[in-house]
Amino acid sequence: MNGGHIQLMIGPMFSGKSTELIRRVRRYQIAQYKCVTIKYSNDNRYGTGLWTHDKNNFEALEATKLCDVLESITDFSVIGIDEGQFFPDIVEFCERMANEGKIVIVAALDGTFQRKPFNNILNLIPLSEMVVKLTAVCMKCFKEASFSKRLGEETEIEIIGGNDMYQSVCRKCYIDS
């Protein structure tokens, strides 16, 4: 066995997906693995690099398609991918990297603000050795939150924002608002 595998962390906004991605990549760095992280280049909310909502920063390559960074990552054995739902080639890329013996760690939204599957991220589930569904805290009633609620009236799927544009909510608060 080549040791390659896929770890997938999914959940709503503000559930700690990016923080967990950074934690996992750091574990491998401590064990002397060569690690790289990749972020979606259109996500420039806080500046360059991978940022968490609580303003922790982590160095990252930027791309809109993962195939664009293939040549840059050949020497790395651990690949972290943030905002995986935005990459159109996420499934093919992760499968290829894992089959080549690389450890691939993906953080992604599983659902849109409309509670629909987010692009093809759910197609990674049957290919992943580990899947973790994280929850947030409902920003209305403070119960467990599994959904992301958009505050504005925009209808496009890809609108990148923070707590100025989205809330994490539980089922009841999603339906009630």
UniProtKB/Swiss-Prot annotation:
Q: Provide the assembly information.
A: Homotetramer. Two molecules of substrate bind to each enzyme tetramer.
UniProt keyword annotation of Amino-acid biosynthesis present = no
Q: Which residues bind Zn(2+)?
A: C138, C141, C170, C173
Q: Quote the protein name from its UniProt record.
A: Thymidine kinase
Q: Does the keyword Oxidoreductase apply?
A: no
Q: Where does ATP bind?
A: G11, P12, M13, F14, S15, G16, K17, S18
The residues that hold substrate are: F113, I157, E158, I159, I160, G161
Read off the lineage from the record: Viruses, Varidnaviria, Bamfordvirae, Nucleocytoviricota, Pokkesviricetes
**Reactions the enzyme catalyzes:** thymidine + ATP = dTMP + ADP + H(+)
Query: Keywords, A to Z?
Result: ATP-binding, Disulfide bond, DNA synthesis, Kinase, Metal-binding, Nucleotide-binding, Transferase, Zinc
Enzyme class, one word? transferase
* GO molecular function annotations of the record: ATP binding; metal ion binding; thymidine kinase activity
Similarity section: Belongs to the thymidine kinase family.
